[in-house]
Amino acid sequence: MTWTTRVLSAGDLPAVGELFAETMGGRRPFIHDQWKFGRNPAGSALGMVAVDGNRIVGQYVLLPVELRLGREVVLGAQSVDTMTHPDYQGKGVFTTLANACMKLAEDHGVEVLYGFPNPNSYPGFVRKLNWDHTGDIQSWVRLIRPSGQPRIPRIGRQLANVLARVMPRGRLLGMDLHVGFPSAEVLDRLVALWESQQGVCRVSRTPRWMQWRFDPDSCMEYEWVVAFRGG
């Protein structure tokens, strides 16, 4: 097997979809890749691919994102969709693509990188790419219908549903909930609230970014719920 590397292009997206199916065991809509890689308000995806003949056998991608550090905004990038075809794993594809892509990002003015690697790619990021583990992601999950979870014994599923309905649901007193995409005025108010907080490193949540991030073309079935208190 011989493979070479080159910069990812928009024309590669169908082949990237095939690689995703081969490595992840499922397919995702083509419109998702167009949304993620080509319509990001911070810039198109920066990526490197490994090619063997007419096949893409590996990919490393950095997604540009504006990061707010206090009052300063810097260009960062998030590592996403790292993939190596099973037949090419253990041959240096991941490391070669990652190093080339990080150099590409540096040339485009990217100053900060971050990512959320899965257990398979985590060792490579830390040991081979010299990334630091700065913390773990906390997940907040609430089961709406526990009886649908296979881990719950059949005999206790109906009881689990009853308990879920009586569990505390949080305080909504004095709040007005609106479902649906908020108006430009509401988005501006949210942005002003976030920007007033100091000493926080986070994605710069501009209205344009939020419209893109939760766009229906992401195919993630996001739903906007806005809570108002006191107007």
What are these model-derived regions, one by one?
Residues 84, 89-103:
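Conserved acetyl-CoA-binding loop-helix of GNAT-fold acetyltransferases
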Residues 199-223:
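Non-catalytic substrate-recognition and accessory regions of acyl/acetyltransferase enzymes
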Residues 59, 231:
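Short glycine-/small-residue motifs
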Residues 1-37, 41-52, 56, 62, ...:
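Short amphipathic alpha-helix that is part of the acyltransferase structural core
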Residues 67, 116, 131-152:
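Conserved catalytic-core motifs of GNAT/GCN5-like acyltransferases
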Residues 105-118, 128:
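Conserved GNAT acetyl-CoA-binding A-motif
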Residues 67-79, 89:
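A conserved beta-turn-beta hairpin within the catalytic core of GNAT-like acetyltransferases
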Residues 37-49, 53, 58, 126, ...:
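A short helix-loop-beta-strand connector motif used in the catalytic cores of GNAT acetyltransferases and
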